[in-house]
From Swiss-Prot:
PROSITE patterns (alphabetical): RICIN_B_LECTIN
Positions of glycan attachment: 95, 552
EC number: 2.4.1.41
Binding locations of substrate: 156, 186, 316, 347, 352
Disordered: annotated span: 45-66
Catalytic activity of the protein: L-seryl-[protein] + UDP-N-acetyl-alpha-D-galactosamine = a 3-O-[N-acetyl-alpha-D-galactosaminyl]-L-seryl-[protein] + UDP + H(+); L-threonyl-[protein] + UDP-N-acetyl-alpha-D-galactosamine = a 3-O-[N-acetyl-alpha-D-galactosaminyl]-L-threonyl-[protein] + UDP + H(+)
Disulfide pairings: 106-339, 330-408, 442-459, 482-497, 523-540
GO molecular function: carbohydrate binding; manganese ion binding; polypeptide N-acetylgalactosaminyltransferase activity
GO cellular component term of the entry, any: Golgi cisterna membrane
Family: Belongs to the glycosyltransferase 2 family. GalNAc-T subfamily.
Species in which this protein is naturally found: Sus scrofa (Pig)
Name of protein: Polypeptide N-acetylgalactosaminyltransferase 1
Metabolic or biological pathway: Protein modification; protein glycosylation
Amino acid sequence: MRKFAYCKVVLATSLIWVLLDMFLLLYFSECNKCDEKKERGLPAGDVLEPVQKPHEGPGEMGKPVVIPKEDQDKMKEMFKINQFNLMASEMIALNRSLPDVRLEGCKTKVYPDNLPTTSVVIVFHNEAWSTLLRTVHSVINRSPRHMLEEIVLVDDASERDFLKRPLESYVKKLKVPVHVIRMEQRSGLIRARLKGAAVSKGQVITFLDAHCECTVGWLEPLLARIKHDRKTVVCPIIDVISDDTFEYMAGSDMTYGGFNWKLNFRWYPVPQREMDRRKGDRTLPVRTPTMAGGLFSIDRDYFQEIGTYDAGMDIWGGENLEISFRIWQCGGTLEIVTCSHVGHVFRKATPYTFPGGTGQIINKNNRRLAEVWMDEFKTFFYIISPGVTKVDYGDISSRLGLRHKLQCRPFSWYLENIYPDSQIPRHYSSLGEIRNVETNQCLDNMARKENEKVGIFNCHGMGGNQVFSYTANKEIRTDDLCLDVSKLNGPVTMLKCHHLKGNQLWEYDPVKLTLQHVNSNQCLDKATEEDSQVPSIRDCSGSRSQQWLLRNVTLPEIF
């Protein structure tokens, strides 16, 4: 009996311990879930810790967020606020996990500990709480603490209440100094960044947009390049965060920055010459002619030496090309560091308004950069964009003085040595309209895009969409597109210029006035009755409908 009683005591004690273990396990499991839910909210008292392992939640590991059908209408209304899926963004944790999208060779690189410190400057205007704070947390969570001096948030006159005191209260509790600087009035990206740079303290200034997410290992390779050469300005690979689902998609290390005829920034394939320079090692930085402008790091002192931003430019637009030209022409280097990845929400439209209108502001800014940096090539730009010549672009004497002081190289040097594959044709037979003798109509790109048909329309003599270049390589170019025909009697389409002749090779006879498509041995003809706005090729007949006048456009009157 005594032995039986002893066994019952042992059994009961064991059962109690098992139940206690189960209780503790369930308790802490639920607590973890509570913490995870809290991280998705807005309470200013929460300080989020670095992500140690992937969470199970919307958008984790960069996966897309799917909105239930019953919430689609509300989602569409919320989308209008910031021109991205605000509902999806608010479902995602402020410190969500992201995949490591670096090249394998980047993951094993070792960087010195004594890299310079950086201040991260982020300008915002009426930004969503979730995207702004997710940017901040990604910087904190994925940056070595001793390299991150501070984060400077510059408020460009936001009107939303949660971006006032609630934001200040929230960032005070973060484990890295975060300063909120307020612009007294709407000043635009350029002047707001100058304000942030002026108050920052790091040896390097890193500019980010307000809807970014930094990935693991993003900072060290940027700072390492600047430590190697303080005159090197570096950009990360810009990954895409979907504005619809907030899916994180890795950007390509095989593209770099350029620009088209209208001085719009464009991404183009990295040319073979740059691959050869790097001996095929894709983990080495890419020398890029221009940068997108939203995300880059620059040595603080060098930023001052080369003239920071052009403070005479307004709001936004053109400043990225201006600083790109200036860096290269004045002795610096501009790189995309392929081992650094930062995501950016790319929107299809802007939610912001611009005083004076977007077109007027960009025309002014582009006029300033053309007058200061493009030398004789500004004439080409003015022919393509005649509206630019009619804007008041202000006083540029200080910027011209800066160029003289820094002994900067001419723009022709930039095109020959840094951007030889530029879309600006340096050697051409004609630049202007291509007019049909019979109809008196002109070829017109109709503002159409790649893979669309070229048009024909009444000649207006104002340049713009009716400016074509007949190049020394016998291409007919409109911006970065070439006229291309792939079949007999086919329509003429606009494809990316490949410089391989083939379907893009045209022979102009200045006596017969014909444009012969060499591959097909047919001639460019007027539009047909079936499609009155699309020219095609036909068997060469010598008819007036196959005769074309190539006329150079005269420079518009400049104010």
